[in-house]
């Protein structure tokens, strides 16, 4: 742009300096405006890609399954937001979880409404009814990943409820079979992620047993942060299930099929659902305990590494102090030698033992000073755990 402005500016200088200033100022303002506009467009595009909610079309992309587990329409479809709220008896704030950032939210949630159940577990967003299941696309794109394909296949199999050879059909109602498939997939993903974290952490700790360097410590720090994030995610899921099982009225409201038949459950009559939730709660609790054990191992290793590094640092400091003590002792000998070497008259030069006397005096002074300093240093080393100094024999 400067190459285009300079000729114009030269022509403007021939007219007047003020005209050149106005031309340069307007060009700079226009360039700054274009940069601001580009930043705004990029931010809006990122927000649009990160959300399920399309501001222009007011639609949400989802896949619908009927009572037999068949995919309605054969593929995912876009549903209007208002239609989704009115048709399923939702509140506008209920869609907040599926309209957030494209990266899955850490906070799991199960919302029970009069005619449906909203579920948000890890990467799964679903709306479960007594005869319909809606799976929301959290990425805003086609749901063609391997994990999602397996989840859809398992969900369809459970919704069909045809029963395996030699086994009867699942006695659980439609909505509970859908919830069971969601919990199984979420826990399977959580378990797979746990195995990866445990394997990586075990390898990092094993490498530190043979040597400690900067790269290994940096990698352990990064892995410790990942473990903390995973621990928070699994802990929130356990707390969500714990809170859900403590609410008897919510558990009884989750029997959607019986409510549709006009026979709602009593507040205390939810033993089937509670047994299902307790099964998955036990698995989540095991995951939480496993990741807490891994975090404890990392912290123990960090403490041991800090102790080793502190010990090495103390050894280096002691080595430096010993060198300083040796130099101090040698300096005392040099001081005596300097006094003897002065070109002044003294009584020592009159005898034949002057040199030997000065040498012996310097050596004795050096040894005494060195032993005294080393003794004091060793006394400082023998510190008790209570903060006092140990006895030195």
Curated annotation (Swiss-Prot):
Q: Which Pfam families match?
A: MRS2-like
Q: Where in or outside the cell is it found?
A: Mitochondrion inner membrane
Q: Which UniProt keyword terms apply here?
A: Ion transport, Magnesium, Membrane, Mitochondrion, Mitochondrion inner membrane, Transit peptide, Transmembrane, Transmembrane helix, Transport
Question: Could you give a single Gene Ontology term from the biological process aspect?
Answer: mitochondrial magnesium ion transmembrane transport
Superkingdom of the source?
Eukaryota
GO MF: magnesium ion transmembrane transporter activity
* A single cellular component GO annotation: mitochondrial inner membrane
Regarding the membrane, this protein is recorded as: Multi-pass membrane protein
Q: Where does the record say the transit peptide is?
A: 1-45
Family according to the record: Belongs to the CorA metal ion transporter (MIT) (TC 1.A.35) family.
- Quaternary structure and partners: Forms homooligomers. Interacts with MRS2.
Broad class of where this protein is predominantly found: mitochondrion
Task: Please give the start and end residues of each transmembrane region.
Answer: 323-343, 350-370
Question: Gene name on record?
Answer: LPE10
What is the protein named? Mitochondrial inner membrane magnesium transporter LPE10
Motif stretch (YGMN): 340-343
CDD domains (UniProt xref): Mrs2_Mfm1p-like (cd12823)
Q: Which PANTHER family match?
A: MAGNESIUM TRANSPORTER MRS2 HOMOLOG, MITOCHONDRIAL (PTHR13890:SF0), RNA SPLICING PROTEIN MRS2, MITOCHONDRIAL (PTHR13890)
Instruction: Summarize the protein's role.
Output: Mitochondrial inner membrane magnesium transporter required for mitochondrial magnesium homeostasis. Modulates the conductance of the MRS2 channel. Involved in the splicing of mRNA group II introns in mitochondria by affecting mitochondrial magnesium concentrations, which are critical for group II intron splicing.
